[in-house]
Swiss-Prot record:
Location of the region described as Disordered in the Swiss-Prot/TrEMBL record: 1-22
Places the protein is found: Cytoplasm
Residues that bear N-acetylalanine: A2
Source lineage: Eukaryota, Fungi, Dikarya, Ascomycota, Pezizomycotina
Listed name of the protein: Small ribosomal subunit protein eS1
Family (UniProt): Belongs to the eukaryotic ribosomal protein eS1 family.
Cited Pfam families: Ribosomal_S3Ae (PF01015)
Assembly and interaction partners: Component of the small ribosomal subunit. Mature ribosomes consist of a small (40S) and a large (60S) subunit. The 40S subunit contains about 33 different proteins and 1 molecule of RNA (18S). The 60S subunit contains about 49 different proteins and 3 molecules of RNA (25S, 5.8S and 5S).
Bias-annotated ranges (Basic residues): 1-18
One GO term describing the cellular component: cytosolic small ribosomal subunit
Molecular function, one GO term: structural constituent of ribosome
Domain of life where this protein originates: Eukaryota
UniProt keyword terms in alphabetical order: Acetylation, Cytoplasm, Ribonucleoprotein, Ribosomal protein
Length: 256
């Protein structure tokens, strides 16, 4: 009888699973901090792989963009239809310091604004802020009935639409190009520009639902750590106190 390897006995058991490792064991949680214009500064948490070898966790976090509802940032449900984009520019400890990266409307809000019997007017302007951020702002507006109007429709003439669009462009250009990104964010939150357009176009055709529906960041200047820390209420300066010199007084020991 030939002595050989019994293939049946040497085979391993079928269906043996490899030892699974928890993927979250190699990850860390980092806090997301919103900049100064917003009321709620702690946005949430984000996961990232721990630093190992040549891979640094901070490099993986920088440049991440988070979309947050403005209602959560301002603690006001009236802003629920607007979404703010925040970009991670710096990581300090376990905190991601973010800056404003853009604004957008929810699709359901945009769809609810479009109705019959009215004209829709849109305009977009590319502007540069005083701190060299290149932005594109998209505005939207709708015509409304004049006081005591009997006619059902509120369609504006082509010449009126052109005049309104020209006015919208002028106001956006003026309001955005004369301020910093932080000041512009402060204007966007309470919709100052939209109200300004509505007021300025009353003589041409009355408008309603005037909004800056989208803000797109096209180009940003060279990264400034001091400016970012100022947005987050921190400072790069050394805040140690100065040494105060006092006159030396010799202590006289009393004789016992």
């Amino acid at each position: 009888m030939a002595v050989g390897k019994n293939k049946r006995l040497s085979k391993g058991k079928k269906g043996l699973k490899k030892k699974t490792q928890d993927p979250f064991a190699r990850k860390d949680w980092y806090g997301i901090k919103a900049p100064a214009p917003f009321n709620i500064r702690d946005v949430g948490k984000t996961l990232v792989n721990r630093s190992s070898g040549m891979k640094n966790a901070n490099d993986a976090l920088k440049g991440r963009i988070f979309e947050v509802s403005l209602a959560d940032l301002q603690k006001d449900e009236d802003h629920a239809f607007r979404k703010i984009k925040l970009r991670v520019d710096e990581v300090q400890g376990k905190n991601c310091l973010t800056n404003f990266h853009g604004l957008d409307f929810t699709s359901d809000k945009l769809r609810s604004l479009v109705r019959k019997w009215q004209s829709l007017i849109e305009a977009n302007v590319t502007v540069k802020t005083t701190d060299d951020y290149l932005l594109r702002l998209f505005a939207i507006a709708f015509t409304k009935r004049r006081p005591n109007q009997i006619k059902k429709t509120t369609y504006a003439a082509s010449s009126q639409i052109r005049a309104i669009r020209r006015k919208m462009t002028e106001i956006i250009q003026r309001e955005a190009s004369t301020c910093t990104l932080q000041q512009l964010t402060n204007k966007l939150i309470p919709e100052v520009i939209g109200r300004e357009i509505e007021k300025a176009t009353q003589g041409i055709y009355p408008l309603q639902n005037v909004h800056i529906r989208k803000v797109k960041l096209l180009k940003q200047p060279k990264f400034d750590l001091g400016g970012l820390l100022a947005l987050h209420g921190e400072s790069t300066t050394d805040e140690q106190g100065q040494k105060v010199e006092r006159e030396f007084k010799e202590r006289v020991l009393e004789e016992v």
